[in-house]
């Protein structure tokens, strides 16, 4: 029997895991970088990917002095590049099967 473990973090835990302030998390949420469930910051729950995204967003904002809109765009483009690299790798493997015959 298999079971699925769903991890959800509240605001306090996310702030601790990502080493950011609650105000920073609110900015990140307002710009759609991380999307919690819940209506208010007190009720927000975040998935297990939120700490990594939050940390990356805060780092881009602080170290590169990007506006939050730029941070959102940069993270979206980085995710797209990662997806394209993954697809490219899969297609190369498929192609390799035909060229080795």
Swiss-Prot record:
Under the heading Pfam families, the entry gives: MerR_2
Q: Where are the transmembrane segments?
A: none
- Gene3D superfamilies the record matches: 1.10.1660.10
InterPro entries to which the protein is assigned, alphabetical: CbpM
- Physiological role: Interacts with CbpA and inhibits both the DnaJ-like co-chaperone activity and the DNA binding activity of CbpA. Together with CbpA, modulates the activity of the DnaK chaperone system. Does not inhibit the co-chaperone activity of DnaJ.
The record ties this protein, via HAMAP family, to:
CbpM
Family indicated by similarity: Belongs to the CbpM family.
What is the name of the protein in this document?
Chaperone modulatory protein CbpM
Q: Where does this protein come from, organism-wise?
A: Pseudomonas putida (strain GB-1)
Please name the taxonomic classification of the source: Bacteria, Pseudomonadati, Pseudomonadota, Gammaproteobacteria, Pseudomonadales
